[in-house]
Amino acid sequence: MTINIPDYDVEIIDPEKKDKLIDEEYRESVSYGRKANLSGMCIKLLTNIKEFKEMWEDNFKSMNEDVRPHGRIFVLDTGGEEMRVLYEPISKTCFLLDCDYYGYVKSLALAVSGDFLEEYHSIHSRHSVHGAAVDYKGIGTAIIAPSGVGKTTQAYGLLLEEDVRLITDDWFYTMIVGNGVDVQASEKNCYIRVDIASDIEKYEELLKDISLDGYGRAVINVRRILGEGAMKENTTLRNVIHLKRDPDDKRLVRKVKKEEALKYILDNDFCNPHLLVRDKRKGKLREKFFEKLYERTTVYMVNTTTTIEKNREQIRNIVLEK
């Protein structure tokens, strides 16, 4: 099932316009407010869409109501014909207007938290990464690639291996401590394409009775499907796998040096289509982070021009360190 998801551009606004939008246009439109705990950050959803409120509650851990938000996302049906995304970076306030796709709600909430971390300078470098991560006996592996290349499919394929546990299928937080990289999950439950069963046969029976949204997706508790041990909150990152699809390159899997990995991540806009602020200063911050990440991990390039099963075998060998 192929469903077209609309693209969006981010309009950066100033604090005055943000205040005017809230006070004069949208304050009376908000029916629900929910705070999420994103690795210790408080991101608040304000919406008039009940379905999104309920999916948010399933998707994220809740935050104590006494904690003031580090960022906010207004998700409102205003009756407009076109979806709009506006962002005010000083207060970390995002507006997602006239959108019917929950994937953008959760991705923009995570993007707001990532923008906060980029501006929060601390002893330990903390950043967010758009990618999947799994744990195998305390050893973490991240799969970072542009959207649509197959990182989510590969992550769920790995979960069928004994002792492999999911940290996240889409987005994670990192903390660089000395020569190590700690990885933290971003979501309580995952928002996934249920047609992943067409790629991984063993999931077909497990996912057949799941209730879907209009985009063929659902927020799913992976533990209920694969058991309580299927997910883990954190791991120590040892391996990074980048995916590419290049029929002119006959090499299917290889280790790469920091310089090639940096070129890959820069050429692919940090493999993150949901970055809210794109300017020279932000680019330098992100490049510096990935340089530190690559210095502390073993980086692999996997070419996805072969079959899903063959790629899964190659990635499995990296994760299991065979």
Predicted regions and their residues:
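Long, basic/Gly/Ser/Thr-rich N-terminal segments
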Residues: 1-104, 312-322
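Glycine-rich, often acidic-flanked micro-motifs
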Residues: 1-26, 130-146, 160, 164-322
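Short Pro/Gly-enriched beta-strand edge/turn motifs at strand-loop
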Residues: 15-18, 68, 111-117, 272
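Structural alpha-beta junctions
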Residues: 66-72, 118-121, 163-164, 296, ...
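Non-catalytic, well-ordered alpha-helical scaffold segments
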Residues: 71, 107, 234-238
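Extreme N-terminal, non-catalytic leader segments
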Residues: 78-139
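Conserved lysine of the Walker
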Residues: 151
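Post-Walker A alpha-helix
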Residues: 154-155
